[in-house]
């Protein structure tokens, strides 16, 4: 049996709406899928108010051993060393463990794991092309340092992770070039049964949506980097043939200090329907009601959780060319990101059922081989490869001879 300790945020059982990012939900699904295939998984997670220090959920042991902040990752690494598992898998986003103050802790945390005889694997949920870091990038991502400083810091961080980990995982094909030697494992999918057309219409009506219009959906945290303004401007141009739904709350990192989401509602409240945060039991209905998911990301630096959800639910996707390169989407799923061009594409889908069917077919084809079970199998193969590569030569020889 493979024994793995993950360092990552993990959903609390009582406050799921307060997740700091999609990484917590990702960790839960991956851990459960690994456990279902016989892997012993322990998660070292941040403390969450009202949650026990230690719990066991669906076969996964969760220990809440550290607080977010400057000491988050070094403290987590110490707990992971004590766990006994040979592999420690860190799920990493730049500000995930407590904002900018937590970033310097990456190096000592990974070094501590290496000196303790552990095999650190790191999944980079965000990968930035240093050449993309300019004034516009820092403004969009609310990074409060000059572009030169941000560029050096982000590129240095990515090199550091590569050097101190035994293997690095990324979610998108285009990120493999930016992190040489990395392993691409796409986001896993929860694959749902197709929703019959009449059932989808009934769901539309129950949500107060028009059945005689194309329902376009933008889903997930409202963040400046997603190009939501472009979708809103396109909907304004497209007119009555398109009904745009913006489903998602303010990003937790921005909610308390940035008016971005409120500004969108104020500027475009008469163009689209803003429904706010969608509780987990209601997510499937919104994807079933949507005729198309819009992902006009201008410069993606991470794979898209809503993209994976759409593939799982069978909801057709229109995405930017840059996101298509990242996730390996075919040309059929690419749409212009300029508002007039996107509006034209939406009107085409609204007026031509054959084009919408072709988009649905392309989306369904891309979903094959991307279930959480597939993602777990790819991780298990990676863990086995890492363990074998770092096993003493004499033991490797004996194992192969005995096989």
Model segments located where?
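Nucleotide-activated donor-binding/catalytic signature segment of Leloir-type glycosyltransferases, i.e.
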Residues: 257-284
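A short helix/loop element that forms part of the nucleotide-sugar donor recognition site in Leloir-type
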Residues: 195-209, 262
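Conserved acidic donor-binding segment of nucleotide-sugar-dependent glycosyltransferases
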Residues: 331-340, 347-354
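Donor nucleotide-sugar binding/catalytic pocket of nucleotide-sugar-dependent glycosyltransferases
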Residues: 147-199
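Short hydrophobic beta-strand element within catalytic cores of glycosyltransferases
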Residues: 292, 311-320
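Membrane-proximal helix-turn-helix segments that form the acceptor-binding/catalytic region
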Residues: 107-115, 119, 143-167, 264
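Conserved donor-binding/catalytic core segment of Leloir-type glycosyltransferases
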Residues: 209-226, 232-236, 245
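A short, well-ordered alpha-helix in the C-terminal region of glycosyltransferases
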Residues: 355-369, 381
């Amino acid at each position: 049996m493979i024994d793995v300790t993950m360092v990552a945020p993990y959903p609390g059982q009582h406050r799921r709406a307060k997740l700091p990012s999609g990484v917590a939900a990702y960790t839960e699904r991956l851990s459960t899928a690994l456990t279902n295939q016989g892997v012993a998984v322990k998660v070292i997670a941040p403390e969450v108010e009202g949650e026990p220090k230690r719990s066991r959920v669906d076969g996964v042991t969760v220990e809440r051993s550290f607080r977010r902040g400057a000491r988050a990752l070094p403290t987590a690494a110490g707990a992971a060393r004590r766990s006994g598992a040979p592999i420690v898998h860190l799920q990493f986003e730049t500000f995930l463990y407590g904002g900018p103050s937590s970033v310097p802790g990456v190096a000592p945390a990974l070094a501590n794991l290496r000196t303790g005889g552990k095999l650190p694997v790191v999944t980079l949920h965000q990968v930035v092309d240093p050449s993309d870091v300019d004034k516009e990038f820092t403004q969009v991502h609310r990074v409060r340092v000059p572009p030169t400083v941000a560029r050096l810091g982000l590129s240095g961080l990515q090199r550091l992770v590569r050097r101190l980990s035994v293997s690095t995982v990324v979610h998108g094909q285009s990120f493999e070039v930016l992190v040489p030697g990395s392993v691409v494992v796409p986001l896993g999918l929860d694959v749902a049964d197709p929703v019959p057309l009449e059932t989808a219409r009934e769901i539309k009506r129950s949500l107060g949506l028009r059945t005689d219009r194309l329902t376009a959906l933008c889903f997930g945290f409202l963040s400046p980097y997603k190009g939501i303004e472009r979708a809103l401007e396109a909907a304004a141009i497209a007119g009555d043939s398109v009904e745009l739904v913006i489903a998602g709350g303010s990003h937790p990192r921005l909610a308390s200090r940035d008016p971005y989401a409120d500004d969108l509602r104020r500027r475009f409240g008469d163009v689209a329907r803003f429904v706010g945060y969608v509780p987990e039991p209601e997510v499937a209905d919104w994807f079933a009601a949507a005729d198309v998911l819009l992902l006009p990301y201008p410069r993606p630096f991470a794979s898209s959780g809503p993209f994976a959800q759409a593939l799982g639910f069978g909801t057709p996707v229109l995405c930017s060319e840059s996101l298509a390169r990242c996730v390996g989407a075919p040309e059929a799923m690419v749409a212009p990101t300029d508002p007039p061009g996107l509006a034209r594409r939406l009107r085409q889908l609204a007026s031509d059922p054959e084009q919408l069917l072709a988009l649905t077919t392309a989306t369904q084809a891309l979903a094959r081989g991307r279930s959480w079970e597939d993602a777990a199998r790819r991780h298990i193969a990676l863990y086995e490869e890492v363990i074998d590569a770092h096993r003493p030569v004499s033991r490797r020889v004996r194992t192969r001879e005995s096989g």
